Amino acid sequence: MIERPTYVNAILRFVDAPLVKVLTGIRRSGKSTILLMLIEALKRRGIPSERILNYRFDSMRYDGLTANALYEMLLAAVARDQKTYIFLDEVQEIAGWEKVVNSLMQDEDVDIYVTGSNSRMMASEISTYLTGRYVSFEVFPLSFAEYLTFKRQYAIPQSPRAELAQYIRLGGFPVVHLQPYTSDDAYTIVHDIYNTVIFTDIVRRNEIRKVDQLERVVKYTFSNVGNTFSAATISKYLKSEHRSLDEETVYAYLEKLEKAFLIHRCSRYDLKGKELLKTQEKFYLADPALRYAVLGYDPDTVAAMLENAVYLELRRRGYAVSVGKTPAGEINFVATRQNDRLYVQVAEKIEQASTEKREFDRLLDIRDNYPKYVLRADDFAHGNHEGIIVMHVADFLLSDAY
């Protein structure tokens, strides 16, 4: 196993706390492997194997298992005289699992860790049945730093700036970077992940009959990363293509895609009025490779995928991210974490002086002292302009400054 210490260390801080540790995120982002890493960390701390229970519920072994049977199975295995550590992988496969977990937490000396990949594991859903007795960790596909670590297992990476293009193109699903796959092979793997999410986590669970309608919404969303739009925008577009779909249905599909962790909603924030806006949101993909695996590679979309990668990195680091609205124009990202804030503009390259001035003017229009960045992917990505930090996207993704 290739370590992912960012997640493991964050979760280990809550070992033995009276909280269920919940790992969420898109399928194949590495949740199951992180559970195994946590188990190894507990063993290094001296916890014997017999006090560690590990179950993976997407296995046929547990097909048809009821909540009552799960409770009896775990109760019989729990140690009577010492704390037992319980790991439940893809626990959403068991209807009523939350009652089992609640009962064990209340009545037994246990420390419980669970993972899940669909809407029942969203924070908004978990809070309804674990009522304050949990702490959640969203697991994302590999960061750029993790991608470089994985690649070092089978090759010598080029410079980070040179590697960025490959990272954007192949994405960060861990399985893609266990060996040197070709782009075609990598996209086959990613497309299979996409199909599993669409047909298992969305179509089957929600009993969607008109799959073609759902896929049209998916393709529109994937094609418009970095653009603001709404359910009404998609509905009007499909109508122009002679594919009628009402706004309410489009909104419901977007919500289901979000709950399956396939896309992330990024609301607009009015920096002058200091309020979140409810219209014309942006949506970013769980991984850049999803766009290329589903729609094919297009070099004209690299700028949007760079923006997508920056969004994901900010989210990995615990920032709440929104799109900034100012009188001078749009700020790609307003990122907030407790008392910290930063502003980020992302551009693949800036070829005209007027474009460069516009990027800086939007940030200079913000009258506060929080860090402001213009990120580029060309040879001029360095320096400082009136306090605005100019960085290469690759350097920003690896930076410890935020």
Where are these regions (language model features)?
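Catalytic cores of nucleic-acid endonucleases
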Residues: 324, 348-394
